[in-house]
Amino acid sequence: MSLLQISEPGQTPAPHQRRLAAGIDLGTTHSLVATVRSGQAEALSDSEGRYLLPSVVQYQVDNINVGWQAKQEAEKDPANTISSIKRMLGRSLNDITSRYPNLPYHFHDNDSGLPLIKTPAGIVDPIQVSADILKALAERAIQSLGGELDGVVVTVPAYFDDAQRQGTKEAARRAGLHVLRLLNEPTAAAIAYGLDSGKEGTIVVYDLGGGTFDISVLRLTKGVFEVLATGGDTALGGDDFDMMLADWIRERAGFGYQNDVILQRQLLDIASETKIALSDNDVADININGWKGEITRAEFELLIQPLVKRTLLSVRRALKDADVDVDEVLEVVMVGGSTRVPLVRQMVGDYFKREPLTSIDPDKVVAIGASIQADILVGNKPDSEMLLLDVIPLSLGLETMGGLVEKVIPRNTTIPVARAQEFTTFKDGQTAMSVHVVQGEREMVSDCRSLARFTLRGIPPMAAGGAHIRVTFQVDADGLLSVSAMEKSTGVEASVQVKPSYGLSDTEIANMIQSSMENAKEDLQARRLAEQKVEAARVLESLTAALQEDAHLLTEDEKTAIDNVVDTLIESVEGTDPVAIENAIKQLDKQTQEFAARRMDTSIRQALAGHSVDEI
C-alpha cells in the first residue's frame, strides 16, 4: 500500500499558522517540557531560567505548590509534600507500602486498594499528583509559546505496564492536555539524536537519574524502534553519589553520626554542589559549619566506582536478555543528569568500546525527543521532512448508545495493529446487538463516516449489562480492517471486513481532522449531553420495570413523590443541559433509595421462605 503522510490540515511554514505542541518528560525526580521553534527543539525554562521542575507537589488547604517551592517545603511539611509519585502510578496501596515502608504520607484506607493520600486539600491519588505536575509544565509552555497547546507527547519508561501507561494518560487528561502519543523514554532520547533516521541496528540508552537507573536495548528497523530488553535499579541514582560523598565529608569533618536532620540536609546539599564542581574541576573546596577541606576528583571517583559498576551489571543483564553482544551495539545514548559525572561516561565508554552520545544535555534529551515527535504529530513539519509511516489516518471505532462514538484504534496508529474492547447489553433480555463501524475524529456518529454494519445474534437473554461482548478491530499491513464481535459465554461470533481508506482522498481526511479540531469543545459538550441522556433512559427503564413488579411496596405519597422527580428528569432530558440531567438523576436515585431497600428485603424474605436455619 502507499505510504500515508502524517499531516494536519492547514499546515504551513508560516510561524503564525503553526500548531503549538510540546514534549513532556514526566520524571521521578524532575520533569521538563520542550517544544520545536523555528525548526529547533528546545527545553522551556521558568521565569527564573530553570529548566528542571522538581516532581514535587505540596497540598495546602487553599493552595497547591508545584516544583521548587514545594521542594523547599518538604522538610517542614513532609506528610503533605508528595515526591517521586511516578513510583506509585499503576500500583496498589499494599505494593507501595511494602516497597517503601517509610513514606511520610497519610494513606486513606479504602476498599479499592488504591494509594489514596490524605492532604489538607482533600484526598489525592497518584494520577492527580501527576496531573498537577503536568499542569504546571503545560502552563510554562503556554506562557512561553503564547497560546494553548494543540497536543503533547508524554514520555514513559519502556518497562511501564498498561496500568501505568493508562494512569499517565489519565493524568494528562485531568491536566486538560490532549495526548498525541505516549512515547518510551529511550525512544525519545534516540529521536533527539536523529537515530530514528539513521543506520539500522541496536541502540542502548543508559539513563542514570537522581533516584533510579534504567537501561534499555532498542532495535531500529525501517525507522521503527523495538524494545528488546529493559533493566536497571530503582534504588540507584545520583542521590546515592551524594550520600556517599556526604558520609565522606561527615567523617573527615568529625561530625559523628548523630541523628541530626538539619545537618544531614546540609551535608547532602554540599555533596551535590561538590559533585557538580568535580565534573569540571580536578579539586573542589568544601566549607560547612566551620569545617573547611577539599576533595579531588580521583578521591570522589574512588567513592562512587562501586555504584557505577552496579549499573554495568544491569547493562550486562539487559544485553543478555536481548541476546545482543557488546560489539553489535551501534550507539550508546546517555540520559539523566548523573551521566554528567566524568567517571560514568568513561566507564560506559570503556564497556562498550565507543564514545557515548553526550552532546545534548542529558537532563533535556528525553523532553527534546518528545517535542520533535509532538511537532510531527500535529503536522508542523514541511513536506520535505514529513515522517512517512504506514498509519491509520483517521480513528476507527463503533457506535454506542446515544449515537456516541467509542474510538477503538486512534488515528496515527502504526499498522498492522489489533485492539479489542468489551461492551455489554443495554436492555433486559437483549439477544442481538447491532455493530456500527465508523471512522473519524468527532464524538457523535452523525459527524463521522459510516464504514460497515453487522449484527451479532444468539446472545443469551440476561439482565441489562449481564452479557459480555468482545469487539476486536484488526488492521493488516495492507490496511484491511476486520471487525469481529463475540459473546464470551457462548462463543457466538459475527464479523465484517472493510477497507477504511477506500474512496477517501487526502483532502477529505484533512477536512475531517480540521473539523474535529474546530468543533472539539462543542463535540465534548454534545457527548456529555448524550451520555447523560443515555444514563437517564437506563435509569427510567430500570425504575419502570421495578414499579411494574413491586409498586405495592410504596405508599401513594411515595409514588407521587417519585412520579414528580421522574417528571423532572423527563423534562430535563428534553432540554440541552447535561448538568440538569445529572442532577435530576441524582435526585431520583435519592428519592428511590428506600424503595430499593424494601425490594431487597422482600427478595431476601422470599428466598428464605420455607427454609430452616440449618438449611441456610
Curated annotation (Swiss-Prot):
- Primary gene name: hscA
- Gene3D superfamilies registered for this protein in UniProt: 1.20.1270.10, 3.30.420.40, Actin, Chain A, domain 4, Substrate Binding Domain Of DNAk, Chain A, domain 1
Q: Which PANTHER family match?
A: HEAT SHOCK PROTEIN 70KDA
- Keyword list, A-Z: ATP-binding, Chaperone, Nucleotide-binding
> What is the protein name given in its UniProt record?
Chaperone protein HscA
User: Which SUPFAM superfamilies does the UniProt entry name for this protein?
Assistant: Actin-like ATPase domain (SSF53067), Heat shock protein 70kD (HSP70), C-terminal subdomain (SSF100934), Heat shock protein 70kD (HSP70), peptide-binding domain (SSF100920)
Q: Which GO biological process annotations does it have?
A: iron-sulfur cluster assembly
Role description: Chaperone involved in the maturation of iron-sulfur cluster-containing proteins. Has a low intrinsic ATPase activity which is markedly stimulated by HscB. Involved in the maturation of IscU.
